[in-house]
């Protein structure tokens, strides 16, 4: 592949740190965007809409009894096929709590955390800033940090965790079948904890500006240098929207909160914080019609409509963030398990039992009323205990006494500096390493742009680590923190994290935004190594 004519502009001696810029195109960069300059300054998915079929209320008479194929506790396989005790679909506080309890009961739960269909491992808390009402954290904790602790605890007790999407499942006959993007699993019970997905407004130009000015994750994208010092807007009037508005004041010059109703629905504490913040303006009775752009194709404003008068106005804003609620991710159970008219999984009151015996639901996928992290965790506990009782009472349980897994070794604890840089190593961090590798590496260079509060970034790292390990001698991996290396991110036009870029022979080959399947990264490396 021929090098872009502008690549290498300003390349100087490699004895001092350089800044790297890169393109933000989803496929290939405009040739003028990637260059290296000399400086001695060292600084730092697929979302989908839920079909909401009409469902009737379930009753005990509608509950299905599926026949078991295993007749004794020693039966862990049928016809040579391994049958797991329990598969947990989804993560978040519900899924991880269920995994902790199931693992401590020696059930060896298999957990499919998901990463695209409906969110990322850790659920909605991965897009939450400060969690101040979860017991045990008097000073609060960020959503991603809380989920990371829960995940490590589940892993410590022996849960098998896979960051894979479940593509289909069958619960009409036992054992149940779960098909993911990479494997097929048989199991005696299922805990369904897929949570809910952020809703979109479906504006006329939403797809055009998605991740280029429109976002449903303030903590993922708000730290982008392109939003720093700009006017931003948030849509919604609940806790999610008010929390996002408050968070964005750390970066924005001013934040506009666009509320359809004549009052906020958020908690009183959140309302007080918003109303008393001079950097936030609340617009009541206001509907978002569309986004506006300038002659350069960049988002420049929002078209608003007053619901009480019908008057339309234009609001200057460089970014629009959604905080308008969620839809339950129950699609995989449609036609198999009873759902209500909004798509929530119906469970027997006070339990996690669905209309199919052996299938349990936990978290926001079955809770349309409370929707709190602590209630989701509680329902995950109930689901795990219920699954254990179900397995025991049906003589299906097989105990697994396995050693506790060691905590994953911490990687990338410090940025590469001149005296510690070693090109023979595969994995690196920071702008110095990127500059050196850009000049000297004959391999494919995979660059991951992250930010400290980005939940999906924590999802993507282990995925990329596995891919990089598979191609250990064919790739170099560099992690760039966009807050530490702001100039790189700004020049690259990085408007959200995570973002991956591939380079080879001083040429940028491709940019991939968000979290994708491992095979997409594998196929690209295989084709270019």
UniProtKB/Swiss-Prot annotation:
Compartmental location: Plastid, Chloroplast
Record keywords, A-Z: Chloroplast, Disulfide bond, Electron transport, FAD, Flavoprotein, NADP, Oxidoreductase, Plastid, Redox-active center, Transit peptide, Transport
Binding site for NADP(+): 240, 265, 324, 344, 371
Known catalytic reactions: [thioredoxin]-dithiol + NADP(+) = [thioredoxin]-disulfide + NADPH + H(+)
Cysteine pairs bridged by disulfides in the record: 217-220, 454-457
Residue ranges with Low complexity bias: 64-78
GO molecular function per UniProt: enzyme activator activity; identical protein binding; oxidoreductase activity, acting on a sulfur group of donors, disulfide as acceptor; thioredoxin-disulfide reductase (NADPH) activity
Primary localization: plastid
Highest taxon in the source lineage: Eukaryota
Family, similarity comment: Belongs to the class-II pyridine nucleotide-disulfide oxidoreductase family.
Protein name: NADPH-dependent thioredoxin reductase 3
Organism: Arabidopsis thaliana
